[in-house]
Amino acid sequence: MGAGEFPTTPPPHRYYAILAVLAQRQGIDKVAHTFLLQPGRWVLQGSWLERDGLPINVKGMTLVAWNRDNWFTMATKLIFPGSDRADIALQYKGRLDIGARQYTFLLQHNILGQVEGEGWIGLDTIVQRYWVLSDRERRSGFETLHRVNDDSYYLTSGIMAGHYLTSTMEASLERQRTN
């Protein structure tokens, strides 16, 4: 390369360093989530689908609280209006260190029992996976929460037994503002 000429593409290590600096300047390296990362009350509405069944309405509420030691609690209650499906109650307790993007949690589920899980916090999505402890059916599940805006998320989730889906849920979550 002669004097005054520029390379057509920077070396790979320089390329990633440049992208990181640009991301910082544009603020896209910062997490903008309000669900889970801030205390609050969220209303859920959507549909629940079980294997070989028709979708049914699901409604619910989630409360998120934090203490000073980076521990969070989350309580969710799901109801199925107009259906004989039993309500679902979930009690989470987890820890997320300041600046971290990964966390672990314990969950008490009124149908599945004791559950352990982990979560990852992306730029626009929170993904959780969990597994039921001491379970002969090898049940596990996942949740993906996609941020629509500060007050709204879209949730998709599924529960599996072994390698097979047994149920899925898709719902919107809307933050309830307190006065």
Predicted features along the sequence, with ranges:
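Central antiparallel beta-sheet cores of small beta-barrel/beta-sandwich binding domains
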Residues: 44, 49-141
